[in-house]
Amino acid sequence: MSEEPVAAPGTISHPVYKLKRNWTWWYLNDERNKSWEERLKNVKTFSSVGEFWALHDSIKPPSGLNPPSDYNVFRDGIEPMWEVPQNQNGGRWLITIEKGRTPEIMDTIWTEILMAMIGEQFSDDIESLCGIVCNVRGKGSKISVWTTNSADDGANLRIGGVLKQVLNNASMIHQRPLYDVLRYEDHESCQKKTSSGVKAKHAIYAVEPREEKAPVPVSTETPATPAT
């Protein structure tokens, strides 16, 4: 039997600063005997910083969920599924979290991106951003940021650049790398293939790989004898 992620309300109060837009937190539980639609629960729509932190601090972090479960936080009015109009032509920036990594890594990535998203750190490109998904799985989890138009390379690359900056800053604070690479995939390709078989449209590395310099050719010719 799946447990709901909501814990008993705490006593910590948070300042109420209004957000520029409302966001809805969704939870997909691990009851595999039910349909996907039956498993998906609307947890809460929040419209202020205080409401966000009150919710964030009162439920389990992603690492505390039973696999296979999902957390989704999307702009209010957008459901966390490929089929809705805002998502059907979109794509995602994907971060893969290998099974051997510590649980805190996933929780940190999730919270850092959430704060950037609701805090409008993506500037005008926030209009191209639909939400964030955390897929908790036993063999390795994923966190992805969904955008509404996979063909809008400019907006998608700028969003990826902000994600890199946010996560690299957090990596320095936590004194350990949080990710290796951000991969951008379109939803249509993901539906047709497994994630490992999807070719990324874009890739952004935490540390850009160094270009291997071609070795300087060594001449095997015998130098000419200088004239006397």
Swiss-Prot record:
Q: Which UniProt key words apply to this protein? A: Disulfide bond, Initiation factor, Protein biosynthesis, RNA-binding, Translation regulation
Q: Which GO terms describe its molecular function?
A: RNA 7-methylguanosine cap binding; RNA trimethylguanosine cap binding; translation initiation factor activity
A GO cellular component term found in this entry reads: eukaryotic translation initiation factor 4F complex
Any S-S bridges, and between which cysteines? C130-C134
Q: Which Pfam families match?
A: IF4E (PF01652)
Its tissue distribution reads: Highly expressed in all somatic tissues.
* GO terms under biological process: determination of adult lifespan; embryo development ending in birth or egg hatching; negative regulation of response to oxidative stress; positive regulation of translation; translational initiation
**Superkingdom classification of source:** Eukaryota
Phenotype of the disrupted gene, per the record: RNAi-mediated knockdown increases lifespan. Lifespan is further increased in an age-1 hx546, daf-2 e1370, clk-1 qm30 or eat-2 ad465 mutant background.
Subunit architecture: eIF4F is a multi-subunit complex, the composition of which varies with external and internal environmental conditions. It is composed of at least eIF4A, eIF4E and eIF4G. eIF4E is also known to interact with other partners.
As for what it does, the entry says: Recognizes and binds the 7-methylguanosine-containing mRNA cap during an early step in the initiation of protein synthesis and facilitates ribosome binding by inducing the unwinding of the mRNAs secondary structures. All 5 eIF4E proteins bind monomethyl cap structures. Only ife-1, ife-2 and ife-5 bind trimethyl cap structures which result from trans-splicing. Translation of trimethyl cap structure mRNAs may be regulated by intracellular redox state; disulfide bonds change the width and depth of the cap-binding cavity determining selectivity to mRNA caps.
Identify its protein family.
Belongs to the eukaryotic initiation factor 4E family.
Report the protein name in the record.
Eukaryotic translation initiation factor 4E-2
Q: Name its species.
A: Caenorhabditis elegans
